[in-house]
Amino acid sequence: LINMSHPEGSPLAFFPPTYYLDLRFSKEDWNQGKTMTLEACAAGHAFLDLYDYTGEQMYYDRALGIADTYLRLQREDGSYPIKIDFKTGEPVNEVGAMLHPLLNYILRLHNQYGITKYDIITEKGEKWMDEIAVETFNMTGQFEDVNVMGLEPYENLTNCTAAPYASYLLNKETVSEKDLNNAIDLIRLSED
């Protein structure tokens, strides 16, 4: 994983590829040379788990390197593109990623390790989720087996984004009335 990830100083520093080798979805034209933006969160969690277990600093440093790249990639409005070019880091379209994986990753860095440097990701990300994704109920699926090129709003709805964000909202240290109401609406959307 480390050897396949982007080196420090590159546009996607420390990000591993979503698509590699000769696997089924790696062969799809729409995935070649691309990566799902939020897939690096899973690698970040894995590096933190390895650090917790082994105490080896390099794993902790890689996890923070991934968070640093997310800090740099966040758009002014708090959003992230769903998929990006793996070499340049440029978005392949304007479809926004649903941010629950990233928000949970940043929450872990804050709660378990006391790191506050990335809290701005949470602040801006929650604002975007609430004002755009939740407000419009455009909870776009984040599946690599779907071509996101030309994806229209509401074309790829799924409970796999609505339900996890509802869970994130309900598991916050302080759940506001707005968080609760949004979570209830998202759960209802998931049931439909």
Language-model regions, residue ranges each:
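Glycan-recognition and catalytic cores of secretory/periplasmic carbohydrate-active enzymes
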Residues: 1-192
